[in-house]
Amino acid sequence: MTTIAKLIAVTIDCAEPRRLAEFYATILGFEVQYAEDEYAGIGDGAVSIYFQRVPERKPAAWPGPDKQFHLDVRVPDVDKAVQEYLELGAGRPDFQPGDGWVVLADPEGHLFCVCPERS
């Protein structure tokens, strides 16, 4: 039988770890665990997101096959959340693939989807 692993963190390559840690801590309600020039981390006690400095990283084209990864978040009011996230530095790509959720890009161009809570 295969040993089951527990996911403890996802690490995101970026040019400015401190900036992205603050952005995601704000929209997810996580605490900044540490923030340095090379590495930063946020978490909620169960899972963490780490940000690793990779200055040569280039944002993926959207839409396109090289988007690398994206996060999905659930919110009670998609329109309200999107407006708040845009004010925090997110961007809204022109191409939106469907209705009911919105694709945004964080301040460094990583894509994430803002999805409604399930009823």
Regions found by a protein language model. Give the residues of each.
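Short glycine/proline-centered loop/turn elements that form peptide/ligand docking sites
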Residues: E36-E38
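Glyoxalase I/VOC metalloenzyme domain signal
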Residues: M1-Y34, G43-P93, A105-S119
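Short, small/polar residue-rich loop motifs at catalytic or cofactor-binding pockets
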Residues: P97-D99
